[in-house]
C-alpha cells in the first residue's frame, strides 16, 4: 500500500478516535480492503448507554494521584478507571463489519494505538492480515500475538 494511503487511513482513524467520549484514552480504528474503508470504530459504551467511559476511584495513596475533586469541602484525589462495559475501537469496527455484507479477509486495520491481546484475537479471527498503528501500548502482548499469527504489523 502506498504511503499516502497509509497516512490517509491513519488520519481517518485519528478523526474517529476524536468521536470517543473517553477521557483517559481515545482510540479509533478503520478497516480497509482494496483501498476502501469498509468499517470504522472507536472506543465507547454500547449504543444507547450513558457515554461515560470512566469511573472515578477515590484514593488516599499519593502514587495514584491523577486528579483532584472537592468533596464535602475537602480536596480528595482520584484516578479514572475505564468501565468494564467499554468496547474497544477494534471490537466496534469488527462487530460493525460482521453486521455488514463486507468481509475483513485479507484486509488491513488502521488503529491509533497498538491493540490489546483480546482485540488482536478478534483481528486474527476477522481474517485481517495487516495492522498499522501509531502509538505503542505499555503491554505488547497484542502485537506479539499478531506477529505470532503471521499478521503483518507496522508502526507508522
Where are these regions (language model features)?
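Zinc-dependent deaminase catalytic domain
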Residues: 1-156
Amino acid at each position: 500500500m502506498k504511503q499516502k494511503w497509509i497516512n490517509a487511513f491513519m488520519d481517518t482513524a485519528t478523526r474517529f478516535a476524536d468521536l470517543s467520549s473517553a477521557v483517559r484514552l481515545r482510540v479509533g480504528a478503520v478497516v480497509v480492503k482494496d483501498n476502501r474503508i469498509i468499517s470504522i470504530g472507536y472506543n465507547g459504551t454500547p449504543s444507547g448507554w450513558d457515554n461515560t467511559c470512566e469511573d472515578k476511584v477515590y484514593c488516599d495513596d499519593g502514587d495514584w494521584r491523577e486528579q483532584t475533586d472537592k468533596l464535602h469541602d475537602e480536596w480528595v484525589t482520584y484516578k479514572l478507571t475505564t468501565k468494564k462495559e467499554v468496547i474497544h475501537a477494534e471490537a466496534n469496527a469488527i462487530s460493525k463489519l460482521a453486521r455488514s455484507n463486507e468481509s475483513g479477509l485479507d484486509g488491513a486495520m488502521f488503529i491509533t494505538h497498538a491493540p490489546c491481546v483480546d482485540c488482536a484475537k478478534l483481528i486474527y479471527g476477522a481474517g485481517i492480515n495487516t495492522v498499522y498503528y501509531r502509538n505503542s501500548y505499555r503491554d505488547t502482548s497484542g502485537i506479539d500475538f499478531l506477529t505470532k499469527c503471521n499478521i503483518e504489523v507496522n508502526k507508522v
